[in-house]
Amino acid sequence: MQSRLSVRDFSMVIALVLICGFFAVMAPPFLSARNLSMLMTELSITGTLAMGMLMIILTGHIDLSVGSGVGLLGGLASVLVFKQDLPAPAALAAASLVGVLLWLLMGTLIVRERIPAFIITLGGLLIFKGLFWLVIQNSTVPVTRGGVANLYSSLTTFYVPPMAGLVLAALLVAILVWASLRSRAQLQAHGFPVEDGESSFLKLFIAAQAVFLLVIVANQFRGVPLPALILAMVTFVVHTLTKHTSFGRYLYAVGGNEEAAVVSGVPVQKVVIAAFGLMGGIVAVTGFMQTAYAGASTTTVGELMELDAIAACVIGGVSLKGGRGSVLGVLFGTLIMACLLNGMTLMAVPPEFKFITRGLVLTLAVWMDVRLSKA
């Protein structure tokens, strides 16, 4: 098992290096400070959504409605701000509450009525898309009123000052090291096998270098964009939940073997419903960032984001069968997808070939998951 995980981990690193190297040669602006700052914003939005998707997939379920939910909740907040003149914080809070309630409802239907998540969330995809268009009345709704900046619009226009960015980078690396050492100690204390020290150190070293490199490059433009901080906070919360709480252990148990989890006393229904409730909150946050990044709610906001989130998870080593996956893997998967899409945009690749490439990458990731699972 350990060797298979190492193959997957290092294959992701190699793939990322090759992708970045290719676009650095074919599209020189790819490594510019301005583009990397934009890339950081884009991957932060997708990565935030993928963190929620990780928890859903860990339970052995799937959520196809998140893309439409991103549009709906972002659009609802825009309408409350622009048309109802509601203060931005109140509008964001109201839309977040709606998101949590909608996803709690879907989670309840899945576990109480025993309806497959695929069907429930597919229905949600269509319903939320229709509601989204009704809410914005098939028009463009700005995130500001009278062009005056507010909390909503600042989600993607605020940048952390350079020195503060470096301090936050150091803090993030310290948290990564602490979390890794704590997790390793807990596994050893319970007699579970742990990764060899060299591999663990190499991963942390690469992660630390990547964090500082991104911050240094971002500081050459305007600084670290706010979405990157939001992703960091969401990532920390999800990592803590999945690795250091009973809820996280239940997520893995339900996805690994639901029948065994029931016998062991795991409250399966509550765990799944809670995972969907958290997903609703994360969809809302993603919707606000995506809409603010676009500058307004339009009928295309959120399109296919569910596929990008699923692809980031699968590329990052999350098993679609449930019970296996990690936050770090999802971050790598998100980074690979974001670099791929950003690079193709810089090369002016036609949309049809972008779709084909995304489909091929997702298919290849699933194929590798199946092959490594059988090895």
For each feature predicted by the language model, list its residue ranges.
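Single transmembrane alpha-helix segments in multi-pass membrane proteins
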Residues: I19-Q84, T108-F118, W133, A260, ...
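Cytosolic-side transmembrane-helix boundaries in multi-pass membrane proteins
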Residues: M1-G21, V25, T140, L172-F205, ...
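Inter-helical junctions in multi-pass inner-membrane proteins, predominant
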Residues: P28-M38, W133, Q137, V215-A228, ...
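Membrane-helix/interface signature in polytopic inner-membrane proteins
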Residues: S180-D196, F236-F276
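Transmembrane helix-bundle core of multi-pass membrane transporters
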Residues: L125-T242, T298-T299
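Transmembrane alpha-helical segments in multi-pass inner-membrane proteins
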Residues: W103, F276-G287, Y293-G359
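Alpha-helical transmembrane segments within multi-pass membrane transporters and channels
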Residues: D85-L126, F332, M337
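Loop-to-transmembrane alpha-helix initiation sites
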Residues: E42, A117, V143-G146, P161-A170, ...
